[in-house]
């Protein structure tokens, strides 16, 4: 069977490889000179630039592609877990190191507003519920049937998907700095924390589940 995949971002490459593993003859079409989509690397005036995202939040999805061809990922790529994920620096000079170290996170939160430590814990628990529904159950399900989408409405309402990410975070967190820190995740996918649906808050828990990695 012949198949054509348009776009060589992570999704396009993954689709092409999965089809190839099923013995399809695959043509991968890309308008840029290099593969990778937003994850491509390009050079200009002697400098090397990342075309988009620079970190990996669910490395097992990449490992799966190598396993389809009985290849060992470590023979081709090096993926390093990061200790500090993001460093936030505010206009007043205050900095916050965001990481998967819960003790460090809570200590930093306590220094800003001790009452928000409990709110942070509750926020993480709530984003786990969003993750369970939005990622674990639905990430690989095609949304091509209106009735199926209608059945999701009660669950989405229960998860407060009508709120923005910032609004959801604000319902748990009172300090403005912490609100901005904990609602930044839509920026990673080109969204606005003040308008993007709170379903994207699942990224907060996704990072805690698998960590953040950098590919060398």
Predicted regions and their residues:
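N-terminal glycine-rich phosphate/pyrophosphate-binding loop and immediately adjacent elements
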Residues: 1-129
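Active-site-adjacent bridging/hinge elements
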Residues: 29-32, 197-203
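Generic alpha-helical structural context detector
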Residues: 67, 183, 201-204
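Rossmann-like flavin
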Residues: 91-197
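Helical element adjacent to the flavin cofactor pocket in flavoenzyme catalytic cores
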Residues: 202-216
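Conserved aromatic-histidine-acidic binding/catalytic patches
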Residues: 7, 153, 157, 215-216
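A short glycine/serine-rich beta->alpha loop
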Residues: 44-48, 188-190, 211-214
């Amino acid at each position: 069977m012949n198949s054509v995949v348009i776009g060589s971002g992570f999704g396009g490459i993954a689709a092409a490889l999965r089809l190839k593993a099923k013995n399809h003859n695959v043509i991968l079409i890309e308008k840029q000179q290099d593969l990778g989509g937003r994850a491509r690397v390009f050079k200009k005036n002697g400098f090397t630039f990342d075309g988009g995202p620079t970190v990996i939040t669910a490395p097992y999805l990449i490992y799966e592609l190598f396993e389809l061809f009985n290849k060992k990922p470590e023979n081709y790529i090096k993926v390093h877990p990061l200790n500090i994920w993001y460093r936030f620096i505010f206009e007043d000079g205050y900095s916050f190191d965001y990481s998967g170290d819960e003790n460090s996170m809570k200590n930093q939160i306590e220094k800003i507003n001790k009452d928000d430590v409990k709110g942070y814990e509750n926020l993480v628990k709530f984003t786990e519920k969003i993750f369970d529904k939005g990622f674990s159950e639905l990430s690989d399900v095609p949304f091509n049937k209106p009735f199926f989408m209608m059945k999701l409405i009660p669950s989405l309402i229960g998860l407060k998907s009508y709120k923005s990410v910032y609004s959801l975070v604000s319902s748990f967190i009172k300090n403005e700095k912490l609100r901005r820190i904990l609602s930044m995740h839509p920026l990673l996918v080109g969204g606005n924390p003040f308008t993007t649906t709170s379903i994207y808050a699942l990224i907060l828990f996704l990072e805690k589940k698998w960590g953040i990695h950098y590919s060398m």
